[in-house]
C-alpha cells in the first residue's frame, strides 16, 4: 500500500481511538505495537535512501529522498527530481540541494540536514548508475525513480520539477526537451549538455526555465550557459539567466541557498494545454508533446511542428520534414486546421489527424511504415534498455573456439569503467540458451553469422543485410526489429576492433560501448578497424537499404542484401 494511504488510514484510526477516550498503551490490546507503527511513519520525514527495481536489468537502484517536515497526507506535494553531477552520487546531490557542505555532505543522518526553508517539496535524487550521462539506461533509471516516488507518496503531477548540476542539469534539460509536458519547471546549474540536446531547445517553450552559472567556472565554462541562453531566446523560449562574477563551479551553493532558485521553482505549475506548442523530434520515441503528436518522420532528421490554437479552437500549424501529425481534441472543438498555409475544413467525427499527399495536406491518418516507435533504430537503441548478449555455438570445433566466442560477448556486455566508477554488466548466453521469454522481454546483441549463430539463422528472413562468409578482415554491425524488440547483429570483426577511445564521439562519461557507436545510424561496415568505415547510414522507412547505400555496400563484395 502506498505510504500516504497507510499514513491516512493510521491517522484516522488514531483520531477515532482518541475520540473514544480509550487507553491506547495496553500491550494486550495491540495498540502498543500500533503506536510504534504510527511513530515510525511520522519519523519518515527528512532524508532517506530508498531503492527501486530497474526496468533495465532488475537490479535495485538507489536514490536519495527528502520528505518535508510538514508532510501531512492526503495533501499533495510538489516533487523535485534532482540529478547529480559527474563523479558524484545521489547522497551528495541531496546534500547540495539542501545546502549542506563539508563533512556532513556524505551522510544521510536526519540531524545533519536542515529543512527546505519555506518549501513543502519532496526531493528525489537518483543515482542513475553513477557517472554515465542521462540518456538511454540512466534516463530510464530516472523515470523509474519518478514512478516509484509517485507510487509511494501523494505527488501533485502539476508540480513536478527538474534541477541538476553540471552533467546532471545536462540530463535535466534533455528530459525536459524530450518529454516537456511532464515538467513544471527547470532550475539549471552550470549545464554540461547531453549529445543532441541543442537542436531540441524549441521544445522548452512552455517549461519555465532559469539558468545559473559562475563566471569563473573552469570545469564547465560559462560559455555553456551563455550559449543556452542565446539558443533558447532565438527559439522564442522565455529564459532567465543569472551569472555570478566571483563564483566557480559551485554555483548551486549560492543559487539554492541564497538566491531563491528553489522558491521560484516551487511556485511554478505545469501548463497542460498551452495555446502554442513547438516540437522538434528526430525519433518516434520523442515525437509527442501536450496536444501534438508527429506521426511520420525520418529517424535522424529533425522534424518540426509549430502549432497555435486560437480562442475559437481553430489551429494553425507550420511543419518541416514531416508527413503526418495528430492533434488531441480540446474545448472549444476546432472547425478548421490550417497546415503550411492550406486551410482544411474538418470532417465531423473524424480523427484530428493529417497527412501530406502529393497534392498537399489533407485530413486523415498517414499510412503506417515499418519504422515506428520501438522499431526505428539507430544502433544505440538496442543498447538503451534490457539486453542480452548472445554468442553462437554452431560449427564450433573445439571448446577453445567456443570459449573465444563467449569471450567476445562478455567483453561487449561489461560496461564497467574505472574512470567513472560505473559497475554495469549484462547477461551473456549461448544461442541455444536463449528462451522465448528472453526474446519477449529483451533486445538481443547477436555475434556471428547464420552459419555460427542459430538466432541469426532463425531471424535471417527479417534481417535486411548480412556479411558474406568470405569477408575476411571486415566487420558489420546493424540493427533490425524482431517482434517487440531489436536484434543488434555483429558479424566478422567485433565493432570495437581498433577503437581509439580518445577520439570517440558522444558524451565524455558514457561507457566505451556507447561512445564508439554514437556516430552511426542503423548500420556500419568497416575494414580492419572501426576507424576505417566503408559505409554507414540508415535503412529507409521500411527497413530496406536506399539504392545508393546498397551500391556502396555491394561494391565491396562483402555484404549480401536481402
Identify the meaning behind each predicted range.
Residues 41-79:
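A domain-start/cap signature at the N-terminus of enzymes
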Residues 69-75, 131-166, 177-182:
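Gly/Ser-rich "nucleophile elbow"/oxyanion-hole loop immediately N-terminal to the catalytic nucleophile
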Residues 79, 83-151:
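Active-site machinery of serine-nucleophile hydrolases
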Residues 83-85, 190, 213, 317:
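The conserved beta1-alpha1 loop
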Residues 158-205:
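Primarily recognizes the serine-hydrolase "nucleophile elbow" in alpha/beta-hydrolase
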Residues 210-213, 217:
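Short beta-strand/loop motif that positions the catalytic acidic residue
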Residues 218, 222-313, 321:
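C-terminal catalytic histidine-bearing segment of alpha/beta-hydrolase fold enzymes
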Residues 316, 328-330, 334-562:
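Solvent-exposed alpha-helical segments and adjacent loops
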